[in-house]
Amino acid sequence: MGDNMHFLPADLSCTSLEEELLTYEHYSESEKSFFICEGVLMYLQPEEIETLFSFIRNHSGAHSSFVFTFMELDNDQICFRNSSALVEKWLSLRSEVFTWGIPRQEVRDFLASVGFDLVQIATDETLRARYIATANPEGLPLAQGECICVAEINVSQIERNRLL
């Protein structure tokens, strides 16, 4: 790992990104940063998600990236499409109830509303075609309904915010 790469784990159910990051000695708000938020947004409320995006947008350098996973909202349901009732029950018993999802076709507009640009969305089909198909032609089962999104801060949004 390079000297400029640091891993800062944070349990957002116990602390805020702001509390963790702004007191971290290696973080600079003016530098381009790369944020990863895997398996988190589906458990947050919409207001918490907007706060997270707002913080990243307002406290990181131009062209910073945010990679996150999200659950696809499908027929008003937030769930893994290929999971059994047993999986749903197991998640429920563990108090892992999904509270936020979004239809894939609405992600670009959502990101624009919070000051980000969509770079790429990877679905189970994308991952299979890109990484698994040649290594496992029999077809390793993948979770359907959770996607990976790569977003970048909209630079004009940063400039507008700094002028206010």
Question: What do the PLM-derived regions correspond to, one by one?
Answer:
Residues 1-164:
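Alpha-helical subdomain
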